[in-house]
Regions:
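N-terminal glycine-rich phosphate-binding loop and ensuing alpha1 helix
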Residues: 1-43
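Generic hydrophobic secondary-structure packing signal
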Residues: 23, 45, 63-67
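Hydrophobic anchor at the start of a short beta-strand
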Residues: 35-36, 54-56, 85
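Conserved beta-strand termini and adjacent loop/short-helix elements that scaffold enzyme active sites
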Residues: 39-41, 57-59, 120-123
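Short loop/helix-cap segments at secondary-structure boundaries that form the rim of catalytic
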Residues: 46-52
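Conserved donor nucleotide-binding strand/loop of the catalytic core
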Residues: 53-65
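Conserved beta-loop-beta/alpha segment of the NTase-like Rossmann-fold superfamily
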Residues: 64-133
């Protein structure tokens, strides 16, 4: 997910340098080898995705739910056997591949996963956050 409006950060934070690369490149690295698509309102993010060979959908729709819907509309016809989908905001630079894989493994091990929503939680408070998998 890369459809933020950059109101609080002042510029497109996904393009801000993090570890000598645009922040969004961390999400690309964590999701390497997975079926993925970036949904964005930003032409600059679109250009970065195209440069990196990442499928991208550019849109101008107003709601966060539009991002989810567009992503699913892209992925489901291409991967009909998909049993779940991770929604990963592009501004999660500390998310590791191991954490993402552990989340996917837990989801796949859940017998009732069709009715489950998996979210990472802040360890001390248990406050749910991103990414989300359902």
């Amino acid at each position: 997910m890369a459809s933020g409006l950059a109101k609080r950060f002042g510029s497109n934070k996904l393009l801000a340098e993090f570890d000598r690369k645009p922040l969004l490149c961390r999400a690309f690295a964590v999701t390497e080898g997975l079926h993925r698509v970036v949904v964005t309102r930003s032409t600059e993010v679109q250009a970065l995705c195209e440069e990196c060979g990442i499928p991208v959908l550019h849109h101008a729709l107003p709601f966060r739910s539009d991002t989810v819907r567009l992503g699913l509309e892209y992925l489901l016809p291409r991967f009909p056997a998909m049993s779940g989908c991770v929604f990963l905001p592009g501004d999660q630079p500390l998310l590791t591949r191991k954490t993402l894989c552990d989340m996917i493994s837990a989801f796949c091990a859940e017998p009732d996963r069709k009715s489950q929503i998996f979210r990472l939680c802040e360890p001390q408070s248990g406050t749910p956050g991103s990414p989300v998998l359902f």
